[in-house]
A protein has these predicted regions:
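Contiguous, non-catalytic segments that form substrate-binding/exosite surfaces or channel walls
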Residues: 122-208, 213
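Acidic, glycine-rich two-metal-ion catalytic cores of nucleic acid-processing enzymes
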Residues: 179-287
Length: 382
């Protein structure tokens, strides 16, 4: 997926991050307010009323963010389709023949279908977000701490504050599985863009009589897909890849079956239509070999050897953990828990040092934009 599409998705995701921060702030503020009460002054009805008002406000903001983002989804997916039409693999063939109006209509209809399905999924995700469940659990903990006369209120509510900040707004699936809303939305939008890129390219290729597929390629590939990325496969052999069977590329190299299909299970590769008559491979053998060699050479971090792919995965994990700790720090700030805020800052500082080390040793460009959290204010560690 291109940089422009990634930027568009990141811009859209800021809306949901803002709602998530608002959710954290509201819960934390109410926890702090409850802590100022005592067993005789606590009023459960008033607390539940305030909670209900806040939940309605959060839900409305989430609905607005979702509705606004639906327009973005259609724009993002149209851009993904436009990239297919300008793909260099089709340039020469399109000089010889044009795409029929019927084929264009099918491709457009498919793109619209994916757009509508993704829009429905985003709406469903927002509607199944457990705002009230996690909010109520945190408030119940706070009320119990005050009602029982605990002397150390902050210690009693600290775990609840941590959970609110670390988990954020959660989607609850029918299976009972929980996942952060922002993570679920981002993955669904990316999956849809990749579906359009791959399947519209295949539809174009079928219309033009293309006989093969070229797999996309990138540096720091996962080990199971690295040997085959950037290679060209007949349609029959690509089907073997997807169905877990042995396969060959068009040069005759035989490969063992792989478990993870292309474009699935968090795979960022896609298959693009390729003509052995018209198309020119996007990636040379020399480039693919260099990427593989650089990946294997890897780097040593804290006495352990990592491939560059593994180092990249480690950086993504650290980025996620720093964001989570910043969310907890925001919750601690609004709950007035300075000790928790200090603890978060120490973890953030330690993670940031490790992140810088991994980036320096691996040569991977740091992505500090992935670690920003609205409302986070660093504090000086005591």
């Amino acid at each position: 997926m291109g940089d422009n599409l990634n930027k568009a998705i990141n811009y859209m995701m800021k809306r949901f991050e803002e709602v998530n921060t608002f959710f954290i702030e509201k819960v934390a503020e109410q926890i702090m307010a409850i802590g100022e009460l005592n067993p005789t002054s606590i009023n459960r009805i008033a607390i539940m009323t305030e909670m209900g008002t806040n939940i309605n406000d959060i839900t409305q903001r989430l609905a607005i963010a979702t509705n606004t983002s639906l327009r973005d989804v259609f724009k993002i997916y149209q851009a993904a389709l436009d990239d297919v039409y300008t793909d260099q693999r089709f340039t020469q063939a399109l000089k010889q023949q044009s795409i029929s109006s019927e084929a264009k209509a099918r491709i457009t209809q498919y793109t619209q279908s994916v757009s509508i399905q993704t829009a429905k999924t985003l709406t469903n995700l927002s509607n199944t977000t457990a705002v009230s469940e996690s909010y109520r659990t945190a408030i119940d903990t706070a009320v119990m701490a005050v009602s029982s006369g605990m002397t150390d209120y902050q210690s009693a509510t600290r775990d609840a504050i941590k959970q609110i900040g670390y988990n954020g707004m959660q989607v609850v699936y029918e299976s009972g599985y929980h996942r952060r809303l922002d993570t679920a939305i981002r993955q669904n939008v990316i999956d849809g863009a990749n579906q359009i890129a791959q399947n519209c390219s295949i539809m174009m290729g079928d219309e033009l009589g293309y006989d093969a597929y070229e797999l996309s390629a990138h540096a720091r590939s996962a080990p199971d897909h690295e040997p085959i990325q950037g290679r060209v496969f007949s349609k029959a052999d690509f089907n073997n890849i997807q169905n877990g069977l042995p396969f060959r590329d068009i040069d005759g190299t035989l490969y063992r079956a792989i478990r993870r299909p292309i474009g699935e299970w968090n795979c960022m590769h896609i298959a693009m239509s390729f003509s052995t008559q018209y198309s020119k491979r996007r990636y040379t053998d020399a480039q693919l070999k260099q990427w593989a060699a650089d990946n294997a050479k890897g780097c040593d971090i804290e006495g352990k050897h990592y491939s560059i792919y593994e180092a990249g995965q480690l950086m993504r994990e650290i980025e996620t953990e720093i964001r989570r700790q910043k969310d907890v720090a925001v919750a601690a700030q609004y709950a007035g828990d300075d000790a928790l805020r200090q603890s978060c800052q120490k973890k953030i500082n330690s993670l940031a040092r490790k992140y810088n080390t991994v980036a320096q040793e691996s040569g991977i460009t740091p992505r500090r934009d992935r670690m920003t959290v609205q409302g986070f204010k660093p504090v000086k560690v005591k």
